[in-house]
C-alpha cells in the first residue's frame, strides 16, 4: 500500500474498506491524470510529470491490441517493483469477473483495482463483487445504466470507457456525452417517472433517485480511452470528466516526459486555451493512432462488460 493510501485510511474516522472510505480516496484523485506504466522507470517519469496515480501493467493497450491473444493480470513482481518505485497511488488491472486476480492484487497492496475491459474477460455474466474487498475498484462504463450497475456492485470510481489503445478520442467523447445526457434527463424527471427510468437503465431505483436529486454520479467520474494530446484531455474535462486516464498516448509518443507533463497541465488548466496552446508546443510525434470506425466490432474493447 502506498503512503497516499495509508494517509487516506488514517484520516478516515470510519471503517477502512467501507464504501465511504473508498469513495473518499477516489475523490482525492479528482482533477488529476492517471498514467499507464510498464516499468518502474516509466512510473518515475509519470510521478515527476505530476501524475496523480499510475496504472501498472505489462503491456499498454496499444500493444495488447496489436499483439492479440489472451490478456491477463500483470506479473506480481512487476507490480511490486512499481509500488516500490513511487510515492503516488498505484493501480493495477484484473480481468472482468476474475475475483481471484483481484484478491492477488489486494494482497500485493495496490491502492486501486481496475476491473478492466482492456484485459480478456474471465466471466461473461458476472462482474466482481467489489464489496468483498477493502481495496477500492474503478470500472468502465459506456452509459449511465452500466455505470450504476458497477456502482451497485461496489465500484468507487467510474471511467467512461472510450476505445483504449487507439489514440482516437471519439468514443471517449461519445460515452462521456451519453452519461452526462442521461444524468441530465433524470434530473428533469418527476419522481414517479424514475421507476420507469430505472427499468430502462436496468439499474437500482435507489441509485437512480440519488443521481436525479444530485445531478451527478455518487462516485468520481474519470474518462479514458484514446486520449493522446493535451487538447484531448482538456476537452474531456469540459465535457464533465473529473480526471483523466492516459494509456498508450504517453509512452507511445515521441517525448513521453514532456507529453506527460503537458497533459497534466492541460487537465489542471482545461479552461485556459493559452496554457493548453503553450504546453502543446514542441511535443513531437503523438502515438500512431487507429480510427475507431475502422475497427471490427469484435475488436472493440469498450464493448466488453454489460
From Swiss-Prot:
<dbReference type="GO" id="GO:0006520">
    <property type="term" value="P:amino acid metabolic process"/>
</dbReference>
<dbReference type="InterPro" id="IPR011060">
    <property type="entry name" value="RibuloseP-bd_barrel"/>
</dbReference>
<keyword id="KW-0704">Schiff base</keyword>
<feature type="binding site">
    <location>
        <position position="177"/>
    </location>
    <ligand>
        <name>D-glyceraldehyde 3-phosphate</name>
    </ligand>
</feature>
<comment type="pathway">
    <text>Cofactor biosynthesis; pyridoxal 5'-phosphate biosynthesis.</text>
</comment>
<dbReference type="InterPro" id="IPR001852">
    <property type="entry name" value="PdxS/SNZ"/>
</dbReference>
<dbReference type="GO" id="GO:0042823">
    <property type="term" value="P:pyridoxal phosphate biosynthetic process"/>
</dbReference>
<feature type="binding site">
    <location>
        <position position="226"/>
    </location>
    <ligand>
        <name>D-ribose 5-phosphate</name>
    </ligand>
</feature>
<dbReference type="GO" id="GO:0036381">
    <property type="term" value="F:pyridoxal 5'-phosphate synthase (glutamine hydrolysing) activity"/>
</dbReference>
<feature type="binding site">
    <location>
        <begin position="247"/>
        <end position="248"/>
    </location>
    <ligand>
        <name>D-ribose 5-phosphate</name>
    </ligand>
</feature>
<dbReference type="InterPro" id="IPR013785">
    <property type="entry name" value="Aldolase_TIM"/>
</dbReference>
<dbReference type="Pfam" id="PF01680">
    <property type="entry name" value="SOR_SNZ"/>
</dbReference>
<keyword id="KW-0663">Pyridoxal phosphate</keyword>
<keyword id="KW-0456">Lyase</keyword>
<feature type="active site" description="Schiff-base intermediate with D-ribose 5-phosphate">
    <location>
        <position position="93"/>
    </location>
</feature>
<comment type="function">
    <text>Catalyzes the formation of pyridoxal 5'-phosphate from ribose 5-phosphate (RBP), glyceraldehyde 3-phosphate (G3P) and ammonia. The ammonia is provided by the PdxT subunit. Can also use ribulose 5-phosphate and dihydroxyacetone phosphate as substrates, resulting from enzyme-catalyzed isomerization of RBP and G3P, respectively.</text>
</comment>
<dbReference type="GO" id="GO:0008615">
    <property type="term" value="P:pyridoxine biosynthetic process"/>
</dbReference>
<protein>
    <recommendedName>
        <fullName>Pyridoxal 5'-phosphate synthase subunit PdxS</fullName>
        <ecNumber>4.3.3.6</ecNumber>
    </recommendedName>
</protein>
<feature type="binding site">
    <location>
        <position position="165"/>
    </location>
    <ligand>
        <name>D-ribose 5-phosphate</name>
    </ligand>
</feature>
<dbReference type="InterPro" id="IPR033755">
    <property type="entry name" value="PdxS/SNZ_N"/>
</dbReference>
<comment type="subunit">
    <text>In the presence of PdxT, forms a dodecamer of heterodimers.</text>
</comment>
<comment type="similarity">
    <text>Belongs to the PdxS/SNZ family.</text>
</comment>
<feature type="binding site">
    <location>
        <position position="36"/>
    </location>
    <ligand>
        <name>D-ribose 5-phosphate</name>
    </ligand>
</feature>
Amino acid at each position: 500500500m502506498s503512503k497516499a493510501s495509508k494517509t487516506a485510511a488514517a484520516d478516515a474516522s470510519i471503517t477502512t474498506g467501507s464504501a465511504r472510505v473508498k469513495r473518499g480516496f477516489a475523490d482525492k484523485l479528482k482533477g488529476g491524470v492517471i498514467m499507464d506504466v510498464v516499468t518502474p522507470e516509466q512510473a518515475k517519469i509519470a510521478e515527476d510529470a505530476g501524475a496523480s496515480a499510475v496504472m501498472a501493467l505489462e503491456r499498454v493497450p496499444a500493444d495488447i491490441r496489436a499483439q492479440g491473444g489472451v490478456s491477463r493480470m500483470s506479473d506480481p513482481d512487476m507490480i511490486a517493483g512499481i509500488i516500490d518505485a513511487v510515492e503516488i497511488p498505484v493501480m493495477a488491472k484484473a480481468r472482468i469477473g476474475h475475483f481471484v486476480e483481484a484478491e492477488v492484487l489486494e494482497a500485493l497492496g495496490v491502492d486501486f483495482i481496475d476491473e478492466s475491459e482492456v484485459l480478456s474477460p474471465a466471466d461473461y455474466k458476472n462482474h466482481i463483487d467489489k464489496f468483498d474487498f477493502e481495496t477500492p475498484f474503478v470500472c468502465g462504463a459506456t452509459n449511465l445504466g452500466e455505470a450504476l450497475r458497477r456502482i451497485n456492485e461496489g465500484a468507487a470510481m467510474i471511467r467512461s470507457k472510450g476505445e483504449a489503445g487507439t489514440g482516437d478520442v471519439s468514443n471517449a467523447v461519445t460515452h462521456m456525452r451519453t452519461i452526462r445526457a442521461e444524468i441530465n434527463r433524470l434530473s428533469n424527471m418527476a419522481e414517479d417517472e424514475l421507476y420507469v427510468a430505472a427499468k430502462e437503465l436496468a439499474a437500482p431505483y435507489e441509485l437512480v433517485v440519488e443521481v436525479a436529486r444530485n445531478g451527478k454520479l455518487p462516485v468520481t467520474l474519470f474518462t479514458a480511452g484514446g486520449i493522446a494530446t493535451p487538447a484531448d484531455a482538456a476537452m474531456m474535462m469540459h465535457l464533465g470528466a473529473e480526471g483523466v486516464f492516459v494509456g498508450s498516448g504517453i509512452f507511445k509518443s515521441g517525448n513521453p516526459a514532456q507529453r506527460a507533463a503537458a497533459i497534466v497541465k492541460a487537465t489542471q488548466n482545461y479552461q485556459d486555451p493559452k496554457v493548453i496552446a503553450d504546453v502543446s508546443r514542441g511535443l513531437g510525434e503523438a502515438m500512431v493512432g487507429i480510427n475507431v470506425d475502422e475497427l471490427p466490432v469484435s475488436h472493440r474493447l469498450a464493448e466488453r462488460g454489460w
